């Protein structure tokens, strides 16, 4: 019938062929979708090279994928967990010892020895913030109005013959 969840027992040859191609991409199709025999000799070599390159990329990607859903979390015993944890910690120790340039950097400056008290204190009143902003604006205005007037020449020529 036409329902979303209905199942039909009789499949057409084309449906079976499509399922076969989807399930097994390495199988070569015996018929094209229109029923004609495929002509492999008419394909240009660039197309086959591109297809081979794409197939190799797909194979590399498939070999690098870890199927997390297929991993059995119950199959590992505690001593295996401990061995892996020890192995990871030794790898991290080797990597951290090779990163000596990180150790040479100075630590961040500390403005206070008790930052939790500074963060827990009362916030600065808004009037104080406005006053600081106003003073900064006055200072900027005063600095921008400074002018240098040239009264005489900067380099004086002496009468040397």
UniProtKB/Swiss-Prot annotation:
Disulfide bonds: none annotated. It holds the Pfam family LAMTOR. The modification Phosphoserine is found at residues 27, 42, 56, 98, 141. Keywords: Endosome, Isopeptide bond, Lipoprotein, Lysosome, Membrane, Myristate, Palmitate, Phosphoprotein, Ubl conjugation. A lipid is attached at residue 2 (N-myristoyl glycine). The keyword Acetylation does not apply. The modification Phosphothreonine is found at residue 28. A lipid is attached at residues 3-4 (S-palmitoyl cysteine). The keyword Ribosomal protein does not apply. Coiled coil: none annotated. SMART domains: LAMTOR (SM01262). InterPro entries: LAMTOR1/MEH1. One of its GO terms (biological process) is lysosome localization. GO terms for molecular function: GTPase binding; guanyl-nucleotide exchange factor activity; protein-membrane adaptor activity. Residues 1-43 are annotated as: Disordered. One of its GO terms (cellular component) is Ragulator complex. Residues 121-161 are annotated as: Interaction with LAMTOR2 and LAMTOR3. N-terminal myristoylation and palmitoylation mediates its recruitment to lysosome membranes, thereby promoting localization of the Ragulator complex to lysosomes. N-myristoylation by NMT1 is required for palmitoylation at Cys-3 and Cys-4. Its main location: membrane. There is a cross-link at residues 20, 31, 60, 103-104 (Glycyl lysine isopeptide (Lys-Gly) (interchain with G-Cter in ubiquitin)). Part of the Ragulator complex composed of LAMTOR1, LAMTOR2, LAMTOR3, LAMTOR4 and LAMTOR5. LAMTOR4 and LAMTOR5 form a heterodimer that interacts, through LAMTOR1, with a LAMTOR2, LAMTOR3 heterodimer. Interacts with LAMTOR2 and LAMTOR3; the interaction is direct. The Ragulator complex interacts with both the mTORC1 complex and heterodimers constituted of the Rag GTPases RagA/RRAGA, RagB/RRAGB, RagC/RRAGC and RagD/RRAGD; regulated by amino acid availability. The Ragulator complex interacts with SLC38A9; the probable amino acid sensor. Belongs to the LAMTOR1 family. Key component of the Ragulator complex, a multiprotein complex involved in amino acid sensing and activation of mTORC1, a signaling complex promoting cell growth in response to growth factors, energy levels, and amino acids. Activated by amino acids through a mechanism involving the lysosomal V-ATPase, the Ragulator plays a dual role for the small GTPases Rag (RagA/RRAGA, RagB/RRAGB, RagC/RRAGC and/or RagD/RRAGD): it (1) acts as a guanine nucleotide exchange factor (GEF), activating the small GTPases Rag and (2) mediates recruitment of Rag GTPases to the lysosome membrane. This is Ragulator complex protein LAMTOR1.
């Amino acid at each position: 019938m036409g329902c979303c969840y209905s199942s039909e027992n009789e499949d057409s040859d084309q449906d079976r062929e499509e399922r076969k191609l989807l399930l097994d991409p390495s199988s070569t199709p015996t018929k094209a979708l229109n029923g004609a025999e495929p002509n492999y000799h008419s394909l240009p070599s660039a197309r086959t090279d591109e297809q081979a390159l794409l197939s190799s990329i797909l194979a590399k990607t498939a070999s690098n994928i870890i199927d997390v859903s297929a991993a059995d979390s119950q199959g590992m015993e505690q001593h295996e967990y401990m061995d892996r944890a020890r192995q990871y910690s030794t790898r991290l120790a080797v990597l951290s010892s090779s990163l000596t340039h990180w150790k040479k950097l100075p630590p961040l400056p500390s403005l206070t020895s008790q930052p939790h008290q500074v963060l827990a204190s009362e916030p600065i009143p808004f009037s104080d913030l406005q006053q600081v902003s106003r003073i900064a604006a006055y200072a900027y205005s005063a600095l921008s109005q400074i002018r240098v007037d040239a009264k005489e020449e900067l380099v004086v020529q002496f009468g040397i013959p």
